[in-house]
From Swiss-Prot:
This is Calcium-transporting ATPase, endoplasmic reticulum-type. The keyword Phosphoprotein applies. Ca(2+) 2 binds at residues 319-320, 322, 324, 822, 826. Residues 1-63, 115-213, 289-312, 822-862, 966-981, 1029-1048 are cytoplasmic. It comes from Solanum lycopersicum. The keyword Coiled coil does not apply. It is found in: Endoplasmic reticulum membrane. Mg(2+) binds at residues 728, 732. NCBIfam families: ATPase_P-type. One of its GO terms (molecular function) is metal ion binding. This magnesium-dependent enzyme catalyzes the hydrolysis of ATP coupled with the translocation of calcium from the cytosol to an endomembrane compartment. The active site is at residue 366. Belongs to the cation transport ATPase (P-type) (TC 3.A.3) family. Type IIA subfamily.
Length: 1048
């Protein structure tokens, strides 16, 4: 039974200790731990049971098209078994058709199982986020390196800098003046959060507001503390996320393409069933006859052999109608799409996501690390000038921790005045951070804010010309890196050597500042302070001017500084004040812990008095900046009809400022109906929520928890939107899993986010999504092209068999030949159509609707027209060979075969009753076709006519592939060389067809013979008109579209 959560954040520390029946100085007893472990279990995430292999295999066959193929294979197998004595075939030759179909299905199943078995790793990645060990108080003794999975609620745990939090815990006491925890991957907050022991006044508050709680998977970056474990295992926030990921995976729906293909498969099944039944039924007279006596049928005669024969024709029709190669061609096209996207830094983990991107209607984006760099940087800073009536502002370029990324605008480090030099000194020395290089990415060690200040110092430079040259040279050569990772910050090092740091006044929540005492080159001590602007300004009595002189901080100057700071804050900048103090009283001569005044530094309550009467130096504005390319990507999405919604865990003002900066909103736009916190949005009724999400324009949801993100994505999907969700944190994982396509960041993204996603951005570049959407749209268009090509070919095959059955002539195509055409000769051109170039205006069209049919009425009409010509030409050449001496000026009887009347060909089944019917042997390549019985002329003797039919079918389909280069544009506008791969594929298909014609044992398997040059000429003459027919249809289609546009 799941325990009701205890709101430890809203209770005092004493009340929490009483609730968990534990003493802070002793911890739990071994006996109590055993009781609680039995009640709460181990502190680990549940391992979801994976699907067994047999279930994965079965799921691969749960597809309409696959089921049709299975049915065709089964019937073909039965018929081959029943008829093998009659046909004289045995072994492999008799079962070629069902074995080939089964081979295709098994191959597809193997690929599907391999993909799926490698897909579900998100929950394992979550486990890696949990701390492996902890320092725990048990039975009055502090146990270091205690296994984290053994923790139970009520345990007393000590945390220090660098520790990974092993469970959700209530902060009981601070062992340092301040405690900060990095929890951006869990909550989306861009800055480390300062924690305290104070209780909150409400039970119902956001995750980010629980400042007296530390959560499993987060990391302590500053300070140390003692905590009480309140939640373990699946009851932690990470555990809740795991459950949400699992629930989201259960809600995964089919991709738009799969829905369309399943719909197409269902219609195809019905059509095949009807046509097969009709073909079989219209030939009933050949296997069922009766006498009519007194107006009533009697004396029924039934021929099982003939019934089976025409049933086999119906099966051949099914084989012809099923595009067996379509699943593999779609898979190949999607795989090619993944390669193209990988070249653009979009790594696709699930093939279907390639096409899903193309119909995306909404992108739900995280802010931190997705729209922004997740790297704090100084955007601008200001100080007073020569007078207290004016400020001077300096803009700073660059958005990363790379010291060489940008510089200070209009800056000359050789002319830095005393005020700017002191600002550089404070930023360099009142600082515990560093920068390291991980591959090509620069990252911060310590607090991101402090790392950004150090990068600013590197951009400011140093006043010493010799040192400046030495630093510049070091940055050029490999010594820029101290080792493989750590970045050498030469300017900061210069300041730290110049002014030795002798004491530190740690940051705390009361005074909101940090101070350091340094020994200046002249031997005197100076206090350097940085902190919250309002707090430092309040404690300052003087202000420094540009020349280094100080003047009293009067009210007018104070208002000037406040006004300038307000202007910076409105841009979404976090403002840090900088100050100093020379008159340190008894600390003026401080040098080490042995100094008499050292006891004052041990008492944090004295820090406020030490940091009073300060001299205000200036203000630094920092931000987590938007990526440079995001603004353009947002505009591209807007033109493409894609809505953008920003869903972030950060605070409302920061989120709105970033959205304005990337021009999701204009600067003067009222955000009353466009910006909400997660809690505010969830408080609305369902109808109000739908109205908000339905409105045009961007939306921003701040302070969003994982459940909020998941609920927004779910609602959008229920509204019929195709949702792409981007993110990089653990908090994004459930929504990434639930979205139609989850997109994770490859560099800054957590493993949890990556494993829950469908696609990973290798460069963390938001604009890569736009490129991927364009590629997805292009792939869909190309898919329509090869589906149109393959289906029109299949329609032609169906019509040819239908005509054969209606006319009563011998079958001109057998199932194994149809399989060869559908799988092999059609495959290369269909695959090559996946390389068709994208339309120029592909990102200026709105996304296609979910309701848009894959095959509309006009496309169906074109299928039927082209298919009819394919069928007529295929059957026509078969009839011509039997009945005509020449055709289109080409002599057909040069091989010596016997001509028959069309009526004889249509009634070939009655051949045994004909009198004086004789046939002559004829040549087929080097082979002489002879007959022991004249009636064999319509079975054994049809090999040449059947070869011509098959060759016409192949040739027409090759020419038809040229028609598929563009849905509406003529070959004059879209010439074949625009896609050279198609020309290569056509050559390959012709080569493969030639192989089965001219390799004897393959010719025997497929029941065909070699053709002469004149016969090939006849094939080409009958096949080429398909291009002219489709050109006429394209012309009509263009006229129809223009008429519709004019009417609109």
């Amino acid at each position: 039974m799941e325990e009701k959560p205890f709101p430890a954040w809203s209770w005092s520390v004493d009340q929490c200790l009483k609730e968990y029946q534990v003493k802070l100085e002793k911890g739990l007893s071994t006996y109590e731990v055993d009781k609680r472990r039995e009640r709460y279990g181990l502190n680990e995430l549940e391992k979801e049971k994976g699907k067994p292999l047999w279930r994965l295999v079965l799921e691969q066959f749960d597809d309409t098209l696959v089921k049709i193929l299975l049915g065709a294979a089964f019937i073909s197998f039965v018929l081959a078994y029943v008829n093998q004595d009659e046909t004289g075939e045995s072994g492999f030759e008799a079962y070629v058709e069902p074995l080939v179909i089964l081979w295709i299905l098994v191959l597809n199943a193997i690929v599907g199982v391999w993909q799926e078995s490698n897909a579900e790793k998100a929950l394992e990645a979550l486990k890696e986020m949990q701390g492996e060990s902890a320092k725990v108080l048990r039975d009055g003794y502090l146990v270091p390196d205690f296994p984290a999975k053994e923790l139970v609620p009520g345990d007393i745990v000590e945390l220090r800098v660098g520790d990974k939090v092993p469970a959700d815990m209530r902060v009981a006491t601070l062992k340092s003046s301040t405690l900060r925890v990095e929890q951006s991957s869990l909550t989306g907050e861009s800055m480390p959060v300062t924690k305290s022991t104070d209780f909150l006044a409400t039970d119902d508050c956001e995750l980010q507001a629980k400042e007296n709680m530390v959560f499993a998977g987060t990391t302590v970056v500053n300070g140390s503390c003692i905590c009480i474990v309140v939640n373990t295992g699946m009851c932690t926030e990470i555990g809740k996320i795991q459950r949400q990921i699992h629930d989201a995976s259960m809600e995964e729906s089919d991709t738009p393409l799969k829905k369309k293909l399943d719909e197409f498969g269902n219609r195809l099944t019905f059509a095949i069933g009807v046509v097969c039944l009709v073909v079989w039924a219209i030939n009933y007279k050949y296997f069922l006859s009766w006498e009519v006596v007194d107006d009533w049928p009697s004396d029924f005669r039934f021929s099982f052999e003939k019934c089976a024969y025409y049933f086999k024709i119906a099966v051949a029709l099914a084989v012809a109608a099923i595009p067996e190669g379509l699943p593999s061609v779609i898979t190949t096209c999607l795989a090619l799409g993944t390669r193209k996207m990988a070249q653009k830094n979009a790594i696709v983990r699930k093939l279907q996501s390639v096409e899903t991107l193309g119909c995306t209607t909404v992108i739900c984006s995280d802010k931190t690390g997705t729209l922004t760099t997740n790297q704090m940087s100084v955007s601008e800073f200001f100080t007073l000038g020569r007078k207290t009536t004016a400020c001077r502002v300096f803009g700073v370029e660059g958005t990363t921790y790379d010291p060489k990324d940008g510089g200070i605008m209009n800056w000359n480090c050789c002319k830095m005045d005393a005020n700017l030099l002191l600002m550089a000194e404070i930023c360099a020395i009142c600082n515990d951070a560093g920068v390291f290089c991980d591959g090509r990415l620069f990252k911060a060690t310590g607090l991101p804010t402090e790392a950004a200040l150090k990068v600013l110092v590197e951009k400011m430079g140093v006043p010493d010309s010799k040192a400046r040259c030495k630093i510049r040279d070091a940055q050029i050569v490999s010594s820029y890196l101290i080792d493989r990772n750590t970045v050498k910050l030469g300017c900061c090092d210069w300041w730290m050597k110049r002014s030795k740091r002798v004491a530190t006044l740690e940051f705390d929540r009361v005074r909101k500042s940090m101070g350091v005492i340094v020994r200046e080159p002249n031997g005197s001590n100076r206090l350097l302070v940085k902190g919250a602007f309002e707090s430092l300004l309040e404690r300052s009595t003087y202000v420094q001017l540009a020349d280094g002189s100080t003047v009293p901080l009067d009210e007018s100057c104070r208002q000037l500084l406040l006004l300038k700071q307000l202007e910076m804050s409105s841009k979404g900048l976090r403002c840090l004040g900088l100050a100093y103090k020379d008159d340190l009283g008894e600390l003026s001569g401080y040098y080490a812990a042995t100094h008499p005044a050292h006891k004052k530094l041990l008492d944090p309550s004295c820090y406020s008095s030490i940091e009073s009467d300060l001299v205000f130096v200036g203000v630094v504005g920092l931000r987590d900046p938007p990526r440079e390319e995001v603004h353009r990507a947002v505009n591209d999405c807007r033109r493409a009809g894609i809505k953008i919604m920003v869903i972030t865990g950060d605070n409302k003002s920061t989120a709105e400022a970033v959205c304005r900066e990337i021009q999701l909103f204009s600067n003067g736009e009222n955000l009353r109906g466009s910006s909400f916190t997660g809690k505010e949005f969830m408080a609305f009724s369902s109808q109000q929520q739908i109205e908000i999400l339905s409105q045009d324009g961007g939306k921003v949801f701040s302070r969003a928890e994982p459940r909020h993100k998941q609920e927004i994505v779910r609602m959008l999907k229920e509204m019929g939107e195709i949702v792409a969700m981007t993110g990089d944190g653990v908090n994004d994982a459930p929504a990434l899993k639930l979205a139609d396509i989850g997109i994770a960041m490859g560099i800054t993204g957590t493993e949890v986010a990556k494993e829950a996603s469908d696609m990973v951005l290798a460069d963390d570049n938001f604009s890569t999504i736009v490129s991927a959407v364009a590629e997805g749209r292009s792939i869909y268009n190309n898919m329509k092209a090869f589906i149109r090509y393959m289906i029109s070919s299949n329609v032609g095959e169906v019509i040819s068999i239908f005509l054969t059955a209606v006319l009563g002539i011998p079958e001109c195509l057998i199932p194994v030949q149809l399989l060869w055409v559908n799988l092999v000769t059609d495959g290369p051109p269909a695959t090559a159509l996946g390389f068709n170039p994208a339309d120029v205006d592909i990102m200026q069209k709105p996304p296609r609707k979910n309701t848009d049919a894959l095959i509309n009425s006009w496309v169906f009409f074109r299928y039927m027209v082209i298919g009819s010509y394919v069928g007529i030409a295929t059957v026509g050449i078969f009839i011509v060979w039997y009945t005509q001496a020449s055709f289109l000026g080409i002599n057909i009887v040069s091989d010596g075969h016997t001509l028959v009347e069309l009526s004889q060909l249509r009634n070939w089944g009655e051949c045994s009753t004909w009198t004086n019917f004789t046939v002559s042997p004829f040549k087929a390549g080097n082979r002489l076709i002879t007959f022991s019985d004249p009636c064999e002329y319509f079975t054994v003797g049809k090999v040449k006519a059947m070869t011509l039919s098959l060759s016409v079918l192949v040739a027409i389909e090759m020419f038809n592939s040229l028609n598929a280069l563009s849905e509406d544009n003529s070959l004059i506008k879209m010439p074949p060389w625009r896609n050279p791969w198609l020309l290569v594929a056509m050559s390959l298909s012709f080569a493969l067809h030639s192989v089965i014609l001219y390799v004897p044992f393959l010719a025997d398997i497929f029941g065909i013979v070699p053709l002469s040059l004149y016969e090939w000429l006849l094939v080409i003459l009958l096949s080429a008109p398909v291009i002219l027919i489709d050109e006429v249809l394209k012309f009509v289609g263009r006229r129809r579209r223009r008429t519709k546009l004019k009417a609109a």
